[in-house]
Every structure is written in structure tokens, then in C-alpha cells.
A protein has these predicted regions:
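N-terminal targeting signals for export/organelle localization
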Residues: 1-50, 197, 201-203
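Hydrophobic beta-strand positions
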Residues: 48-52, 167-168
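Short active-site neighborhood of thiol/selenol oxidoreductases, capturing the structured segment around
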Residues: 59-83, 89
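Conserved helix-turn-beta segment immediately C-terminal to the redox Cys motif
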Residues: 66-68, 84-108
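Sec-exported extracytoplasmic/periplasmic mature domains
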Residues: 94-101, 126-130, 149-153, 192, ...
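Thiol-based oxidoreductase modules, predominantly thioredoxin-like and allied folds used
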Residues: 103-116, 132-144
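Short, internal strand/loop/helix patches
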Residues: 122-162
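Thiol-/selenol-based redox modules, centered on thioredoxin-like
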Residues: 160-203
Length: 203
């Protein structure tokens, strides 16, 4: 029964597209690609996002490349599903241990970047005892929408945001989705499977 439940809360990206894009695309922001960009960098792009401390990050190069990430979409004014998801993320933050902020990061991306300013998100993050390595991200709407689109979390109407966590190990290429409102202990199992994934040994 436990395995069946885990199968229910996990869905592989392979069942949709490579990274599970949303069906409806936002307007693409101006994008610049380096000549030596990797396939992953070209896909995810380096749109600039801003965290709760006002720090700027390139989406792929700074936030994803070589890292284990748990990504969630939310908005600070959500009072139903988002608090539940964020409490689960608080549990995953503890599960990450001293790797949080080193090679493991939690990325909570606002679907309401106009309202969710860095200042507002800084106060919001305190509610969930966010430690260094848990970024609450906002920025220009076109950049935020594009980042969400690339992880399959973009919605035209912010009230319809997803209750799905995207959990990935960029180094090994293992990506999973999990129901963000599931029990924290079940999400921890999914997180651990991605965290502990190893790249195949080279001959």
C-alpha cells in the first residue's frame, strides 16, 4: 500500500515532455545565449530572478546547474494550499541538513511577482523559518513567467497555481514531480531518492 501511495504522489517528467512544460506559453522575454551554452542552459534559460534578500540570480546557471533542487510555485496571499506546501518544504529543509545552501536548494517561485516584492517575501519567509538555501523568488513578471513555464508551473491565472513540487538532481538528470500537499514523510522519501541519486560510473 505504501508503494502504491508513493506511486500516486510521484509522476515522472517522462510522462509529459522532457521537463514537463505547461501547455500554454507566456510571452518569451528577451533571451541571450552564450555560444557554448549547454542543452540544459538553452532549455531553462538564464532569466534573472530576485530572492527575498534582493539578490539576483540567473535561473539555470546560478539556481539549477549542478544542484539538487526542490521547486514550488506559490503566492504570499494564498491562505489555503500554499501554507501546507510551505510547511512541507520546511520539513524538507530539515531533511537537507547541512547540504542546504551548498548543493541543495529550495526554490519557491511566486506566481504573483507584482505583489510579492522582495521585502514582502523576506517577511513571508520568516513564517517558515527559511534558512540560507531556501530562496523565495520574484522579479520581472516576464522572467518569472518564463521560469515557471520551463518547469511546467506556468498558469495564466495566478489563482490556479499548481500544488506540485518539482524535485530534481541536475547533475544526474533525475527529475520527479510530487504532490505538494502529501504527507511530509512521503515527500521526504521522494526527496531522498533524488538527493541520493548517483550518476552512472564512467568506464
Amino acid at each position: 500500500m505504501k508503494l502504491l501511495f508513493l506511486a500516486f504522489i510521484i509522476c515522472s517528467f517522462a510522462t509529459t515532455s522532457l521537463y514537463g512544460q505547461s501547455r500554454e506559453a507566456p510571452v518569451a522575454p528577451p533571451l541571450k545565449e552564450a555560444e557554448n551554452s549547454s542543452t540544459a542552459q538553452k532549455y531553462f534559460s538564464d532569466v534573472v530572478l530576485v530572492n527575498q534578500h534582493g539578490q539576483q540570480f540567473r535561473f539555470y546557471s546560478d539556481l539549477l546547474n549542478g544542484k539538487v533542487v526542490v521547486i514550488s510555485s506559490f503566492m504570499a496571499t494564498c491562505t489555503s494550499a500554499c501554507p501546507v506546501k510551505n510547511r512541507n518544504l520546511e520539513k524538507l529543509q530539515e531533511a537537507a541538513g547541512d547540504r542546504l545552501g551548498k548543493d541543495v536548494f529550495i526554490l519557491s517561485i511566486s506566481v504573483d511577482p507584482v505583489t510579492d516584492t522582495p521585502e514582502r517575501l523576506k517577511e513571508y519567509a520568516k513564517t517558515y523559518h527559511a534558512k540560507p538555501g531556501w530562496h523565495f523568488l520574484t522579479g520581472k513578471k516576464e522572467n518569472v513567467d518564463w521560469a515557471l513555464y520551463k518547469i511546467g508551473q506556468y498558469v495564466p491565472e495566478k489563482e490556479n497555481h499548481f500544488n506540485v513540487l518539482v524535485i530534481g538532481n541536475e547533475s544526474t538528470g533525475l527529475w520527479k514531480k510530487a504532490f505538494g500537499l502529501a504527507k511530509a514523510e512521503d515527500l521526504t522519501i521522494v526527496f531522498a531518492s533524488v538527493l541520493n541519486d548517483k550518476a552512472p560510473a564512467k568506464n
